Structures are given as structure tokens and as C-alpha cells.
Regions:
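Short runs within selected transmembrane alpha-helices of multi-pass transporters and secretion channels
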Residues: 76, 145-163, 171-179, 200-213, ...
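Transmembrane alpha-helix boundary and packing residues in multipass membrane permease domains
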Residues: 28, 32, 44, 81, ...
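Helix-terminus/linker motif at the lipid-water interface of multi-pass membrane proteins
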Residues: 37-56, 125-132, 188-195, 255-288, ...
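Transmembrane helical elements of multi-pass membrane transporters/channels
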Residues: 23-42, 144, 178, 207-211, ...
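Hydrophobic transmembrane alpha-helices of multi-pass small-molecule transporters
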Residues: 67-70, 182-186, 212-216, 288-291, ...
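N-terminal transmembrane alpha-helices
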Residues: 12-49, 63-78, 82, 107-114, ...
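Short alpha-helical transmembrane segments in multi-pass integral membrane proteins
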Residues: 1-25, 83-148, 192-248, 304-371, ...
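Small-residue-rich hydrophobic transmembrane alpha-helices
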Residues: 55-115, 152-171, 265, 279-342, ...
Length: 448
């Protein structure tokens, strides 16, 4: 294992796979955990200061916001796969080419996304069946979030660049700063300044913008391998096309999953504010316990890409098994939590004293948590396949998740209510887990 102390890069082509995956995943885990704690704090502040109605306003558009952020995350992680392979191969000139086009593609897409969503926001909220009494606040919150899309994309791009060269610690430090700033601004905007639900959105956009700016300064000062000039645009069209395909493949994979969540959110909105509030609390807590799977998935993607680039394919299976073991340990802790402490956590996060809200939030978690390991298998193997440059298989897997959520949203939830919402993800996880396991089995010979 070789690290450069100045830039914190991590060469994952040499050394113990378990230690490498763990070392890279830990900062990602704490970063994701920090992000989820921020989301919990954001929800708790809104719930305690503004009440259940504010939670319903945020919850009504939370799936749409998740679609945007996960598209940005997927796009930049896909673009960064080329950077990881170039780093693993020691090709410094190619790294500059990748950085150049990564910035161009990412920021261009952010402007297009912002424009499209701003033009379509009102029809989208109508399609989501947002209740009339919630519409005005949801519209205000969403508008501010959409204006901040370029900041969201920029920060995700810079974090992906750093992670591609093995540095998962610096993005954690920026996320720590962003979260502390965000929580402070949340309270200031919603309580003393009485900016209402718009204050929560503005705090998010402002903190992401500041973090993106500071990350840019750090990369410019300390990472000459990521610097580029005008001449670095001069590459073969095939090179750019490969980056675009990888970026949009991972973005679409994330987007397809989240489109299903948006459609499902529409069916939840139709159930009324009580279930919207229960769902936002349930998702905040569920996502907190999903964080190790996401961190390990990103670690496996970087580990796989670097070892593919370095010609060390036989090391990849060891890294994947290490990731499975680490998640199994976390799952045991998760089951202890959901068995003994879930109701208290719901009260803390939502600030709600409504017995029906607490019951339905806890029900969602108790049904989904036993099957979280299937979600981890999906994420880890999907990232392994992407690191091996198999882009269609994960995309098909995400499409299966979309189909499952559409079926539940259109037919099952209207018939069986919120109980069907609780069953939706576990059922789709099992189906997609089987598919991804088959894909990994078919690709096993490439790892010899």
C-alpha cells in the first residue's frame, strides 16, 4: 500500500485487499453517515420548529430531490471511472484529458438539468399528487433546490475526482464542514430569521456552493495531476464517447432507480399528509443504515477500476468478499437497533407525537431491515461490474427496480395502502439481487 501524504492518494493495486477496501471505505462511510445525520438534523429542525406540516412539504418532493442528487452522484462517479483506470495505469497525461472533459461534461449537464426542471416543476408536482395544502411550501422548497443544481453537481464532481485517485478523506472533511454549516444555517434561517421552509432549502444550496468553491481551491493548489489546459481538449472522439457512456450509464442507473421512487412518492402523496410525514421519517432513518453499503460500493468501484487498469484482475474477488464481510457486521448492529430502539429514534427525528406517524414509520423499518443484505449485494456487485466496464448489466438491474416500483405504485399501493409501500423495496431488492448475482457469475472468468 503506497500513499502520498501530501495529496492522500491511495494506490489500491498493491497491498492487502481487506485493508485497502476498509481504509478507502471508512472516510466514505463517515462522510455518508455525516450526510445522513445532516438529513436527520434537517428533518428534526423542520419538525420541531415548523411542525408536521413542514415535514410533509419536504417529504412531498424528497424523492424528486433524491433523483437530482443521485443523478449528479452517478454521473460524476461514472466519469471518474476513466480517471481511476488512468491512475491505476500511471498515465498522467490521460488523467489530464479525463479531468478536462469531466469538468466540461458535468457542468454542461448541470445547466441543462436545472433549466429543464425549473420549466417543468409545476407539472411535476401535479403528477406527484402533492396535496393542495402542501403545494405552496413544496413549490418554494423545490424551486430553491433546483437553482442550486450546478453547486450540487460541482461538489459531487470534485469529490469523485479525489476519490478516483484514492483520496476519500478530503471529501469527508469538506462534507463535515458543509454539514456543520448547513445545520447552523438551517436553524438560523428557520428559527431566528423565520424564513420557513424556503430557509431549509437555501441553507442546503448555500452550504454546497461554499464547499464546491473550497474543494476547487484545494484541487488547484495540491493536485497538479488533475490540472488541464486548452490543449487537453484535443482527444479522439472515441475517448470522449467512452466517458459520456460511462457517465450517463451510472447516472441513468441512479436516475432509473429514483424515477421509480418519484412514481412511488406520488402514490404515497395520494394517501395523505400523515403517510407523507411517516415516509420522510422512515426514509431518513433507513438511508442512515444504508450508508455502509453505499460506501463499500464506491470503494469496490475504485478498487476494481484501479486493479483493472493495473492488470491485477485476480485481486478483485478478494476486495469484493472483504466488502461483503464488512457489511455483514454492520447489518447485525442494524437489526439490534430496529428491534429495540426504533420508536424512540422516530420521535427524535420527526419531532412528531402522532401515534399513527410513529407506528407507520417503525413498520416501514421493521419490514425492510431484515432484507438490507440483499441491497448491499446489489450495490457492491453493481459497482464491481461498472469498475470492470460492464455498463449495461447494472443498468438493466436498475430498470428491474424501476419496473417493481411502478407496479407497486400503480396497482399494489392503491389496493393495500402504506403496508404495500413498506413491502416495495424489500421485494424489488430480492429480484434485483438474483439478477446481479447471475451477472457476476457470468463475468467470473474475467477475474482470473
Amino acid at each position: 500500500m503506497e500513499t502520498n501524504e501530501k495529496s492522500r492518494v491511495l494506490d489500491m493495486t498493491r497491498g492487502n485487499p481487506f485493508r485497502l477496501v476498509l481504509k478507502f471505505a471508512l472516510p466514505l462511510f463517515f462522510g455518508n453517515l455525516l450526510q445522513q445525520f445532516y438529513n436527520l438534523a434537517d428533518t428534526a429542525i423542520a419538525g420541531h420548529v415548523l411542525g408536521d406540516h413542514a415535514l410533509a412539504q419536504i417529504g412531498a418532493v424528497s424523492a424528486l430531490y433524491g433523483l437530482i442528487t443521485n443523478f449528479a452522484f452517478g454521473m460524476n462517479n461514472g466519469l471518474a471511472l476513466s480517471l481511476s483506470r488512468s491512475f491505476g495505469a500511471g498515465d498522467e497525461q490521460k488523467m489530464k484529458h479525463v479531468s478536462c472533459w469531466m469538468v466540461t461534461i458535468s457542468m454542461s449537464v448541470s445547466i441543462v438539468l436545472m433549466s429543464i426542471f425549473l420549466l417543468c416543476k409545476e407539472p411535476l408536482l401535479i403528477l406527484l399528487q402533492v396535496p393542495e395544502e402542501t403545494m405552496a411550501g413544496a413549490m418554494e422548497y423545490l424551486t430553491i433546490i433546483l437553482i442550486g443544481i450546478p453547486f450540487t453537481m460541482a461538489y459531487n464532481m470534485e469529490a469523485a475526482m479525489l476519490q478516483a485517485v484514492g483520496n476519500s478523506m478530503t471529501p469527508l472533511l469538506f462534507l463535515l464542514f458543509s454539514s456543520v454549516l448547513n445545520i447552523s444555517l438551517d436553524y438560523a434561517f428557520m428559527a431566528p430569521l423565520a424564513m420557513g421552509i424556503g430557509g431549509a432549502a437555501f441553507a442546503t444550496v448555500l452550504s454546497q456552493g461554499v464547499s464546491a468553491f473550497l474543494a476547487f481551491i484545494l484541487i488547484w493548489r495540491n493536485y497538479p495531476l488533475l490540472h488541464f489546459k486548452g490543449k487537453d481538449y484535443q482527444v479522439e472522439k472515441k475517448f470522449v464517447l467512452e466517458m459520456v457512456v460511462a457517465g450517463f450509464s451510472m447516472a441513468l442507473m441512479s436516475a432509473i432507480y429514483n424515477i421509480g421512487s418519484v412514481i412511488l412518492q406520488g402514490s404515497i402523496n395520494a394517501l395523505g399528509n400523515l403517510y407523507i410525514t411517516a415516509q420522510v421519517g422512515a426514509r431518513r432513518l433507513a438511508e442512515l443504515f444504508h450508508t455502509p453499503g453505499l460506501a463499500l460500493g464506491t470503494s469496490v468501484a475504485t478498487y476494481t477500476s484501479q486493479n483493472m487498469g493495473g492488470g491485477n484482475r485476480n485481486r478483485i474477488k478478494k476486495g469484493v468478499w472483504s466488502a461483503f464481510f464488512l457489511f455483514a457486521v454492520w447489518w447485525i448492529f442494524s437489526m439490534v437497533f430496529v428491534t429495540f430502539f426504533v420508536e424512540d429514534a422516530v420521535r427524535l427525528v420527526t419531532g412528531s407525537s402522532n401515534a399513527d406517524v410513529i407506528y407507520n414509520t417503525a413498520l416501514y423499518l421493521r419490514i425492510s431491515f431484515p432484507l438490507i443484505p440483499t441491497m448491499a449485494v446489489i450495490i457492491i456487485l453493481r459497482n464491481m461490474l461498472q469498475g470492470m466496464n460492464h455498463l449495461m448489466m447494472p443498468l438493466v438491474g436498475s430498470s428491474l427496480e424501476l419496473i417493481g416500483k411502478v407496479i407497486f405504485a400503480i396497482w399494489v399501493v392503491p389496493a393495500y395502502g402504506y403496508f404495500a409501500v413498506c413491502l416495495c423495496e424489500p421485494v424489488t431488492w430480492v429480484v434485483c439481487c438474483i439478477f446481479v448475482l447471475i451477472c457476476a457469475f457470468l463475468c467470473r472468468k474475467e477475474l482470473r
